[in-house]
Amino acid sequence: MKPRRASTFRTFCFLAVAAMALLARIAIAAAPTDTKIVLAVDGVKVVRNLPVLLADHLGYFKDDGLDVTLKETAASAEIDAMLADGRIAGMVAYYHHTIVAQSEGRDCASVITMAVTPGYELLIANQLKGAVKSLSELKGKRIITGGPHSAKSTSANWLMLHQGLKITDYTAIAPKDKVSIAASLKNGEADFVIAPEPDAGFYAEQGVASVFADLYSVEGTRQSFGSVFPTTVLYMSMPYARAHPELARHLVNAFVRTLSFINAHSAAEIAALVPEIVAGEGKEPRVIAQGIKMFATDGLMPADAAQQEANAISALFPDYAKVEIAKTYTNEFVATVLKK
């Protein structure tokens, strides 16, 4: 009887080892192989693009089988051409670049919306405090914004339109350095300024301006614009994305996970993971504390917000009005990821 028990034990061990080897082979076969891609980013180390570095540092790209190289570059027609042939897999930049691309015949669209507020504050010159009490009183005011295509100018235009005013009802003042801007606010040469942190805090600390409207938080943005304001997106060439749907899905999945992480952690916890940003514009804790308010919870593009942003841009650039806004974004990849 003893030899039989020994034989049975040896057989059991053999089968166990064989089973483990088989499972290992299956696991290896199922594991995603790293796909080398290039991701273009309009500002790798800026807070509005925080999800890019965070996804990289958290290993979320790797988890989805992606070996990602980040390329620092501005959005352009040349980049769109590289998106079309796959030299670059995707571009992280402001949503309005998809409207520009579509107006020029390039089929680019956002595949995930990461930031849904401008990431600014509208500050009023302290000498006007009390004299102007609501956004409906912006008519005739002088606002320091940005260049014509900038998110700051689009924000100012959208603020006017939402109040039933025209974009010609205010005077846009070109931005300068923050010391000069502070002087303009103090000397009565400007009434308002649209600014991010840490500049907004600088104007407040200098005693020349105070926050009039919060354009960082979702709640504040809805109050000021009537909807959220899509800013940071990942966009792709749609013919390329349709030809490589798994690649698009893996990228979107990594960013959906990153948005969940941002919404579940404190500014201090997040700052500890992105020393590159902290070493730059995030030196002051309030920069990241304010910045993380910009980010969506799920990555879906709200149709009403996309249309309203297009309206604000088209008010200054009428040629963009011909763009079919439904072609500037898709929620299909995010919806697939969220169903998992």
What feature does the model see in each segment?
Residues 241-319:
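Secondary-structure end/capping motifs
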Residues 50, 116-122, 209-210, 230-234, ...:
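Small-molecule pocket liners
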Residues 63, 216-227, 293-304:
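Short, solvent-exposed loop/beta-turn-alpha elements that line the ligand-binding surface or hinge
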Residues 96, 180-274:
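Pocket-lining segment of extracytoplasmic ligand-binding domains
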Residues 1-9:
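N-terminal secretory signal peptides that target proteins for export/translocation
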Residues 310-340:
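Conserved C-terminal helix/tail region of periplasmic/extracytoplasmic solute-binding proteins
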Residues 31-168, 172-175, 191-197, 208:
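Short, glycine-/small- and polar/acidic-enriched structural segments
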Residues 12-25:
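Bacterial N-terminal signal peptides
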